[in-house]
Amino acid sequence: MSSAEALAFDVIVIGGGHAGCEAASAAARAGARTALVTHRFDTIGVMSCNPAIGGLGKGHLVREIDALDGLMGRVADRAGIQFRLLNRRKGPAVRGPRTQADRKLYRLSMQQMITEQENLTVVEGGAADLVCDGERISGVTLADGRVLKCGAVVLTTGTFLNGLIHIGEKRFPAGRMGEKPALGLSERLLSFGFTLGRLKTGTPPRLDGRTIDWQSLDMQSADEEPVPFSLMTDRITTPQIECGITRTTPETHDIIRANLHRSAMYSGSIEGIGPRYCPSVEDKIVKFGNRDGHQIFLEPEGLDDDTVYPNGISTSLPEDVQLEILKTIPGLEKAVLLQPGYAIEYDFIDPRELKRSLETRKVCGLFLAGQINGTTGYEEAGAQGLLAGLNAARRAAGSEPVILQRTEAYIGVMVDDLTSRGVSEPYRMFTSRAEFRLSLRADNADQRLTPLADEVGILSEERRKRYLTRETALSHARMVTQSLSITPNLAGYYDLRLNQDGVRRSAYDLLSYPDINLDRLIAIWPELASIDPVTREALEIEAQYAVYMERQQSDIAVMEREERLLIPSGLDFDAISGLSNELKQKLKQRKPETIAEAQRVDGITPAAVALLIAQIRKFGGRQKLAAETLEGKGAA
């Protein structure tokens, strides 16, 4: 960056974590000249906490990131060392692909993809301040005095925003262990009028795997046939490993209870609220003290790394207490502690300050993604980063933003939850958060989102070809199975028990029966044997859900109609007779743009919605496709 021209970009992304990498890549793929600002290049893609990607709900997000040509799925496929499909025995809608990852492989693979991305420049340095021209972002000032000009900024600070690490009675500023926090940006955000809060997360101690008694432990293997995250991955080639399973003991619990006053969580040192679904071991003992033990997964951090991550004992107890705890856990009696567990507090912004494009309402061109929005988890961060980066590029180019609806993607569910409801604790994704789980499956993420990625210009030619090849194969298989039919009487000859109503049923219809798969149908129609395994699985799942999907479409249509009914920007909520003063205040503060958004405002009632619709009609509001106007007219 030797010339003045090199200091001007369309989009600047601050932070090289999971949100930052996806944001920078998406902005660059969208054609924006993009800068990724990070303290050090070698920390790009670091897995700060657990060495794993995916899981229940989270695996859906990774598949959606991949369907939009993001990075996380491909990187996880390269670095994954223990692939497991969670909820395999349940329906496809709630299955969760997951892998443990080699930390080093993951980081290096992510850095390689960032380096190879066109339109993307990595700028080493700390972001000290944001530069504005009126109420519009115009640049970033670095700690060394350099000023980078831009049309949009994506802020992905993770736990670095006023980060504070706690280990027992000790506490010190840090973004994560061994790295400095970002101290200046919080003041700038406060000056913009944003509402900031404090959240907390934690991590367990790291252990020397050579000092663990693996022989005494139960071991968990990877799936025999690993299921990749990415459409671009033909098969997993990285060696797969086992992890160990152990449990805390009553003696463990006694030590924790005796030292609760020394835990940062229970001594009053920590202000922030921690994640409900990833509690510290202190929380587990206090809240579930009647249990004899709590499960711990001992996850190796790499193929050539002896470090082990004990998943299940996140803690902020003093180091000496952590050592005592280890001695009471089977298999860990002689384990050497390489790094103590710790809690970390950090600033976040109330995500209700955001539009669904992830642009802030107060500052034009400023986008937020990841833990700064109150979420927890790599996958949640990466998904937000991709959407924020794409929309930052579109903002810089003067284009309308891309809004993902709740009916389209788990990303849409998450963003809508954040921007309409806010957070009282770190938010993580679950399949139960989605109203239309049957539609939003991990296996159909490509069908749902890849055409959109192509439409907005962030899809590579290689992925386009692969997607079209797969869709063509599925379409042909669907056509063939729908063209073949059989009577109930003849089906009985092949031991298929159908209702004897005389109605012919197609092979496609038969696949909806729980005890019928393609293998059984090949006995009737041998030509079906030519369908390849990937297409076969997709066809079976599609046919299985076809009837239920038809029923769900009416519910989806209702929600889509509500999304289309726009609330005019000039509507005076105070003038709506019959609304309580409390609701008027909430609506003025929240500024919902559609009836669907208004329905998700706390305290809104069906009667209040009816009053609001009547006022819109009186005002002269009219229905238009949300895709044509939402976030792009009054929100622009």
From Swiss-Prot:
Keywords: Cytoplasm, FAD, Flavoprotein, NAD, tRNA processing. It is found in: Cytoplasm. One of its GO terms (molecular function) is flavin adenine dinucleotide binding. InterPro entries: FAD/NAD-bd_sf, GIDA_C_N, MnmG, MnmG-rel, MnmG-rel_CS, MnmG_C, MnmG_C_subdom, MnmG_C_subdom_sf. FAD binds at G15, G16, G17, H18, A19, G20. The keyword Flavoprotein applies. It comes from the Bacteria. One of its GO terms (cellular component) is cytosol. PROSITE patterns: GIDA_1, GIDA_2. The keyword NAD applies. Signal peptide: none annotated. GO terms for biological process: tRNA methylation; tRNA wobble uridine modification. Its cofactor is FAD. Homodimer. Heterotetramer of two MnmE and two MnmG subunits. Belongs to the MnmG family. NAD-binding protein involved in the addition of a carboxymethylaminomethyl (cmnm) group at the wobble position (U34) of certain tRNAs, forming tRNA-cmnm(5)s(2)U34. This is tRNA uridine 5-carboxymethylaminomethyl modification enzyme MnmG. The gene is mnmG.
